[in-house]
Each structure stands twice: as C-alpha cells, then as structure tokens.
Amino acid sequence: MDAEKNLDFKVDIRDIDLSALPINDDTVDLDGYANAHGTLTGTLSKPFFHGDVSSKSIMINGEELTDIQCKLDSDGGIKNHLLGSFKQAPKGVLSAELDYNHEQKLLQGNIVAIYGNVRSILKMAKADYNVDGLAQGEIAINPHGSGSGIFVDVWVDDISINDLKYEEMKFKGHLQDKVWYFDDVKLMETKDVTDKGIVAVGGKVDLANGKLELEAGAVDANPALVTAFMSDPVEVTGDLNMFVQLHGTLKDPEGNGSVEVKNGSVAGIGFDDFTAMLSLANDNLKIEQAMLNKDIYKASAYGDVPLDLFRSKEQRRDPNAQMNVQLNLDNARLGILQVISPMVEWGVGETQGQVKLAGTLEEPLVYGAVKIPDGSLKFKHVQTVIENIHTDIEFEGNKVALKDISAKLGKGSFKGSGTYALRSNEREAYQLDLVADNAEIASDIFTGRINGNLTVTPQRFIVRPEAGSAPPPGKGPRFSYRPLLK
C-alpha cells in the first residue's frame, strides 16, 4: 500500500469459514470452507478483489455442492461478478454467471444445469417436497434489469411426485413481482408422446397476496395423480381425462372441474367408466354429479367431501370432518357387487335403494338399505350359482347386514342371515348363518348336498405353486382365504 492508500496485494487465503460470513440468515444456511487466491487492488476505502475461489465441498441449507471452481471480481459494493461451476450428486453439473449490485440489491445472470438433482435444489430453496428428477435447462435472473424477474426453462427427466413417476416434465415459467406465471408446464408419462399420458398446467400464483388462477388438464393420464398428495393414497389405475379451474386464495381455493376415468380400478376393484362434475368452495369438494359404470350396471352419486380428508390427521382443520355422499343403486343391479367386493365373480338382478357414504377415506362408513327382489350371484372359489336371491341389505357403518336371505342352491334351497365387514382382516370378513334344505354346492373345498344348519366363514389355506412355476416371493408359505362350511 502506497502513500495514496492504493492497494496492490497478492491474496492467498485458506479455509475461509463460510458459516461466519454475514450472508447467513433465515433463508440461507451456508456451511463449509473455501480458499481464495488472487489480487487485492483499488484503495483502502474501495478495495477490489480479482481472483479464484474454490472449495471441495460446501453446504447450502444442508445440501452439498462439490468441486466448486469460481472466478470472482468484487469491490464489495456495486460490482460483484461471479463465473463458476460446481457439481451435485449423483451426476449433476451446474454453472453460473452472476452479477450482484449490493447497493441496489440487484442480482442478475444465468444458471445452467445439466442433470441437476431436483430434490436437492428444492431443499436449497427451503422447499422440502417429495419430488425427484434430473433437471436440464437454464434460469435467467433479471435479464432485462431490475424487477424483470426470474425466467425458468428446464426439462426434468425421470421425475416422480410423491412416488408417482413420469418420464419427462417441461417447465417454462417466470417469477415477476412475487407472482409465478406457468407459461408452459407439462408432465409426460412417455417421452416424446404428446397425445396421451399428458398433464398440463397453466396460470399464475401470487405469492405475495396468496392468490391463484390456475387451469389443469389431463389426457389419458395416470389417475393416481388425483391421490398423489393424499397422506395415505389408495391404488388407482385407468386412463384419466380431466379439466380443472382454480381461483381464489392458496388457503381456501375455489373452482370446478370434470373428471373421467376409463377402464379403471380402485384398490384392485375394476370399473369400465367413471365420470364426475365437481366444484370446490369453503374447503369442501362437492360432487355435483358422478356416475360409475361396470358392464351394463350403473351407480350414481352426489354429495360433499371435505378437503380435510385429503390431509394427514395432524393437519386437518376439523378433526371430525367426514364425507357425506349419497349413492343411488336403483340402476346398479346386482353386478355392481363386483365393484364393491373382489370375492364376487359376477351377479345379475335388480337392486333397489340408496346408501350414504360417511367417515373418512381411510375409514369409510356406509349407511342405508338395499333390497334385492330376485337375483343370481356367483362367488369365486364356488362353482355353484346362487339363484332366486331375495334379501334386504342394511349398511350399518363398517358392517353390512344381510337380513332374511332366501335363495336356490342347486336343486335345493337355503335361508338365513349374515354379516360382512367392509374393513377387517380376512379371517373375520364375513359370516353367514343358514338353514339348508337339500342345498347342492360345488366349491374348491366341498362338493355335496347339505341339510340342516350351517355357518359359512373364511378359512385360511396355503397357496401352493403350480408344478414348474416359480415359488412365491418372500420367505415362508403364502396364505389366502376361502369359504368354510361347518
């Protein structure tokens, strides 16, 4: 340093403690050690650093970046120019060219990512979501000067959202004045296929005022998207076509939509077609009209499902929230039992009555009554068809009570009553108490004629693999249940 206080130093600083820097605050937790090598010029009151900054590893909000190599020109005020690259597990490479004006609090520049770890990047931004994928693209920060915003144009490969997988996602959007604009956002189940397996989102979210205006559509997509953010999602399959509009606030959104699922299933129970018209207001999802079809059978529904039921129990605003959905079975016919129970192979005959769905999605309850004036039913593992069925069915929450059953079984008949549990272990799933009169039955475990009193309950048995087939996965024998007569 000369008499004019001009600086001309060579700088070689090792193991700079990044956690001690004044940039640490509530949004950024910086940790690790860096080395600086270069020159310090300028004056004592306005020093200027030119050189290299490097580190083997740094942590940003608990997420690691490695092999940091940067060139830095900085006066600590108006001019701060950074050109650098760094790596991110498992195989990400990111580069950045940034300018920061400390006096104007203005950050400008570009960040380019190749195979960037999406989950890790989100955590760096203190957004901890169950989202995975590898991102490639560019982020431009204030490219047209102060306030022009952040522009994102990236593709994400092998993306999963709450374990729901897509091959590719396109995200093109920008943030301006604390408003996120979704310019072109698409999720694609199959790469380069643009006419099916697509979910698209457009609109904006005002982060400052907590408002949103969004539209979302799906074409032959995986319907598991609908349940992806449930705390305990049920298994849903089929082809989803959907259009949804949302507006209002982030806390209490409003909107409407239409949903169709073709050739689908819920928890392994199949249907041909499901359609619904929905509306959302006051933290409640209203089913304006819904129709479920299976072969020639139909069931319709309407009612209310509080959004609390899609949240974990700890996050529910109303811990006592329950759904209230009316289900009309007058046109369902007996074949609809295939949708309700996997034990039923097929059924024919009229059904008369209505039931109400209550409870939660995890523990649904059913109330109401259905009458079967004359029908036929075929159970799995039982070869004999039950004909001329007459019964009154009462739904009592988790229990289905079969009152005054009478039916023809072979050349004989039976009458009696029974119960069926909607949720229970298989050992206690059902019990039928019957009086048989020359009833003929052929099943996997019994074939013959029955007279007298009998009880039908589930029996556990070992599932033995067929000759030449591979053994079942896992250790030990695999068990299943079938009807036991006693």
Predicted regions and their residues:
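Membrane-proximal interfacial segments on either side of biological membranes
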Residues: 1-87, 94-188, 195-401, 405-412, ...
